[in-house]
Amino acid sequence: MDPQQIKAALGSGLLSFPVTPFDAENRFAAAPYQKHVEWLSGFDAPVLFAAGGTGEFFSLTPDEIPAIVKAAKESAGKTAIVSGCGYGTEIARGIARSVEAAGGDGILLLPHYLIDAPQEGLYAHVRAVCQATGMGVMVYNRDNAVLQADTLARLCDDCPNLVGFKDGTGDIGLVRQITAKMGDRLTYLGGMPTAELFAEAYLGASFTTYSSAVFNFVPALANKFYAALRAGDRATCESILNSFFYPFMELRSRRKGYAVAAVKAGVRLVGFDAGPVRAPLSDLTGEEEEILKALIDAHRE
């Protein structure tokens, strides 16, 4: 898939990022992963993000990532697969090349590791990764890797395969400046934790879609909310926010890392063998899983 094709796919509907299952020896479990990806691809997501943030990219080795991408491609049907990519520049360039060799359709460039960097350094990092691959690249603005509008404009001029921008800062002023400056040069994707909570605000800032974590275990509900959002059906959006998303947010906020662990628990609760989260994350307690189960059962469609 060429960069313009993945750009179009990214903007064509609701997106998600499958969890990465691990077996009893803490190894990537390909069979249950493929079963889950196949199920998700039946709910019309144009793109799934393999080995993304909710897929525990931060706990994967670079060698595991192409295997995960290959497994996803084999089971996703017509759904495009974009892979997580990140760490330091040279590691990220290597991951980008390995994802392309594994048949991936694009990469989502997550923040580099640990250290803060000036805009010139961020520019050099993103440019180097874009130059390492012919695939389309989406940058993820968050934490220690926040590109300002002028830096992003330079990258758009210098990197034809930079096709997407995902925001996890929540800084609507910055993202509105970026969408005003870049226009349709990029596809824009909301990337806040439990993105539905922020979807209306981002829609007003020209972000027409987002990646839904709960799509992992209640995809029909996620699609219902997204359809209501795009149709301007605020009554349905408010109803689903109050009955599902705010209670889920309350559970997710109990401990650091639950933005991933709660999603993985949800996948297990709907019948998939997702296994545990890897350290340094912790799984939900038994009591918390019961709370999540009741929430899911009340919203199955």
Swiss-Prot record:
Its EC number is 4.2.1.41. GO terms for molecular function: 4-hydroxy-tetrahydrodipicolinate synthase activity; 5-dehydro-4-deoxyglucarate dehydratase activity. HAMAP family: KDGDH. It is an enzyme of class 4 (lyase). GO terms for biological process: D-glucarate catabolic process. SMART domains: DHDPS. Belongs to the DapA family. This is Probable 5-dehydro-4-deoxyglucarate dehydratase. The keyword Lyase applies. Keywords: Lyase. It catalyses: 5-dehydro-4-deoxy-D-glucarate + H(+) = 2,5-dioxopentanoate + CO2 + H2O. The keyword Lyase applies. PANTHER family: 5-DEHYDRO-4-DEOXYGLUCARATE DEHYDRATASE 2-RELATED (PTHR12128:SF19), DIHYDRODIPICOLINATE SYNTHASE (PTHR12128).
